[in-house]
Amino acid sequence: MALPLPPGLTQNEVAFLAEMEMVTVVPRQRLDSIDLLGGKTPQLRPPHRAQLPLWLALLLKKQRRANIVPPAWMHPASLAEIIHRETKEDPEAFSPPPPPPSRALYSQPGTARRLNPSYLDDFTQTQQDSQQDPNSILSPPFLPSNVAESPAGYLPYHWLEVAEALLTHAGDDMPAPAGEVRSLLRDLVEVRAAKMRSSTSALEGFGDAYLTLRGVGAMELAENRAFLAGLVDGVRKIGASAEATRREEEEEARRGGDYGGDGDEDSDEDMGL
């Protein structure tokens, strides 16, 4: 009998989904458009850059038909800036995700706005028909993101998976020696892992304690899902036990009050004291 699968995505599944992220390539030879499930790919015409899914870019790189342009956030200066921010400027929180992308609406060409649910609905229906809150601002993974367009100083949702894939299969395309980039990524992973473990201390308070995961990547969530789920479940059980004990003590105190003072006075009167 097969064992039940754990809830959530596994690390291999997260890495597979990350291969759908877009990256920038510089083609070495001409290639016509390819029909994919997500639409047609752009025609490749050297030396013009184009954006392709990561899996296709890695395939062309393996065939020596294109070079991959590393995203801006993978530059050593950007990684060093993120590490400094997470260790010196704000050691308690994770670095914020990239700002929501801007896109012009079909109904208002020439104007670019930050994407939110109302603007997303405008691509398929009029903005007046949208039932979403126009003031709500979402971020990846709840908005379409693009690793290739993520600015320096911010980590996209699939930053760890994309970085590992590019360093493994396109290390010669890195803006610096692959060893330097890998060392910075290792330091960043260790800093964020330690921060993830230490941030769980906020759950020790049973009141309004909460754990914020803003800025945490997909692979980090997959790696720590079992730990966090077990921790939350343990805190919930401890809190339920403490609440049950408190209610029992209150019930005993109330019963003691009912049988206490008035009963003693009545017994004294009966004895003529």
UniProtKB/Swiss-Prot annotation:
It is found in: Nucleus. It comes from the Eukaryota. One of its GO terms (cellular component) is GINS complex. It holds the Pfam family PSF2_N. SUPFAM superfamilies: GINS helical bundle-like (SSF158573), PriA/YqbF domain (SSF160059). Residues 261-273 have a biased composition (Acidic residues). GO terms for biological process: chromosome segregation; DNA replication; double-strand break repair via break-induced replication. Residues 244-257 have a biased composition (Basic and acidic residues). CDD domains: GINS_A_psf2, GINS_B_Psf2. Transmembrane segments: none annotated. Keywords: Chromosome partition, DNA replication, Nucleus. Residues 88-110, 240-273 are annotated as: Disordered. The GINS complex plays an essential role in the initiation of DNA replication. Has a role in chromosome segregation. Component of the GINS complex which is a heterotetramer of div-26/sld5, drc-1/psf1, drc-2/psf2 and drc-3/psf3. Belongs to the GINS2/PSF2 family. This is DNA replication complex GINS protein psf2.
